[in-house]
Amino acid sequence: RYETRIEASYDLIWEMREPGGVDWSADWPSEFGISYESLAPKMPDGLCVNSYNRNGQKSSRHLPPKGGIVEMSPGMNSLLMYNDDTEFIIFDDLNNSVSAKATTRSRSRASYTGNTLDPASKGEPEKTVSPPDPLFGHYIEAYEQLAIPIPETLNATLRPLVFSYLIRYEFTHGTEYIGLA
């Protein structure tokens, strides 16, 4: 049997700290009005494992988020893994592990008819977007699938490829010109 047990874990982080940068997790101001932990992505609902054999043939398996058994072609395979619960992420060219791409749609929710508090909008549609779906990924360029009676365990840590952003504005004057965001 040509099977491997995938054991997946996820880096559920939302902040990539630069060397010497601020450690926001240790010094998060309460005046931000939101907790540091609430910005972290949630555990995904599923895992997609794409295996590509040496001839470039692709096989996809949909598993629970922590993994499971994957059947692969014997010999060398490339593996591309990502969370299987993305609603607004578009995957392209997954038939080739080298050229696979993921992107968000240009607009992911319907426009609304303008800000009712702003007379200048005159009911004109305003382009808005939903926050991007969390996307986690892991890639293994070469994995040798052996014929063994008990599946070998392959640990994979999926890292975030899409992040949340917290944007804060602080005003010293002109607050009377600010509408509801």
Feature map (PLM): residue ranges:
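Short helix-loop boundary/capping segments
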Residues: S164-A181
